[in-house]
Amino acid sequence: MALNTPQITPTKKITVRAIGEELPRGDYQRCPQCDMLFSLPEINSHQSAYCPRCQAKIRDGRDWSLTRLAAMAFTMLLLMPFAWGEPLLHIWLLGIRIDANVMQGIWQMTKQGDAITGSMVFFCVIGAPLILVTSIAYLWFGNRLGMNLRPVLLMLERLKEWVMLDIYLVGIGVASIKVQDYAHIQAGVGLFSFVALVILTTVTLSHLNVEELWERFYPQRPATRRDEKLRVCLGCHFTGYPDQRGRCPRCHIPLRLRRRHSLQKCWAALLASIVLLLPANLLPISIIYLNGGRQEDTILSGIMSLASSNIAVAGIVFIASILVPFTKVIVMFTLLLSIHFKCQQGLRTRILLLRMVTWIGRWSMLDLFVISLTMSLINRDQILAFTMGPAAFYFGAAVILTILAVEWLDSRLLWDAHESGNARFDD
């Protein structure tokens, strides 16, 4: 018995066209964080690309023209004298008006014999932002004059995390709450300039795509075929072959399989920071003279006294001054041990922890910024005066060393310790 099946006739004509040209192939790229070699397709503007294995951002879609970056830099340069030299806060102490600005706080630190601690604050609040705007201006002028731009481009990517104007702005709020127990506070004209400078700096850093600047100024022929001998440069993120001198053909720094002496430098910085954190938390970090009496505060006791007036601000200072430094030390110690013992479990967790400490590390400088600003506000000789204690130097040095330890660690070593050939990683 035959089955009668109805015929289905399409209502619209289906047209099949042959592909007349070869589909576009992607360029081969190595991930600078996990060293995976993959094919990167062509990316349009405002599109980002991520590593298929570790999800690290390979290409950032946010990109401004150099002219727009230069305009932002010149605007920031105009704001800087007002943000640093004009009063941020006014207080009335014992019937006398006192003005506080950024430069005055750094000068008070240096004047009291601790120039190293003052230079830490100076670099993060004044030096690094000033280098940022002058570097962008150098790129703008240098591109037109045919100057060598490689050193500036190499420095810009590392400079971003040292620009800490946003953290200093939080420190202004913390210092205001600490001082309000002794005097009446009012915002100064410099505060508005400083807030504007923070906003412009944040926007500029978020749109400063150094890798795209490398592509514009020093374009290189990408690798179009897969080759395990391809290496990625950690300076400019170019994937290719080393030249005859073993250097990256684009930025001219040595092109090595792994960062040289990464573990040794990381261990040295980490152990030194552990040693410095002990006096930083045991010795007094601030000293207040009130009517001839002397009151010393460690980091913890200062947080407890701050909690009596504002528990939320005390929580912020606790996280930045105690929780973050010790968390960074514990995480980095764990990561280094996992590399030495070739741990194969929990790779995803370790990668996330490394990215976390990379982002939060700079916030530990908050305590030094609060001390710097408070020193310029309260300084009335023996009637009422505020000065920093010996722990300030140890704390600042420990924070900087932990930042350097994270920067010096080559994250690809975590993958080397893991089993080879993993296309995915999980716990």
Curated annotation (Swiss-Prot):
The keyword GTP-binding is annotated on this UniProt entry: no
Membrane-traversing stretches: 76-96, 121-141, 270-290, 311-331, 351-371, 383-403
Q: Name one GO biological process term.
A: membrane organization
Q: Which GO terms describe its cellular component?
A: plasma membrane
Please state the span of the N-terminal signal peptide per the UniProt entry.
none
Q: Which PROSITE patterns match?
A: MULTIHEME_CYTC
Q: Which InterPro entries match?
A: PqiA-like, PqiA-like_proteobact, PqiA-PqiB_transport
Q: Name one Pfam family in it.
A: PqiA
Which of the residues are on side Cytoplasmic?
Answer: 1-75, 142-269, 332-350, 404-427
Protein name from the UniProt record? Lipophilic envelope-spanning tunnel protein A
Organism taxonomic ancestry: Bacteria, Pseudomonadati, Pseudomonadota, Gammaproteobacteria, Enterobacterales
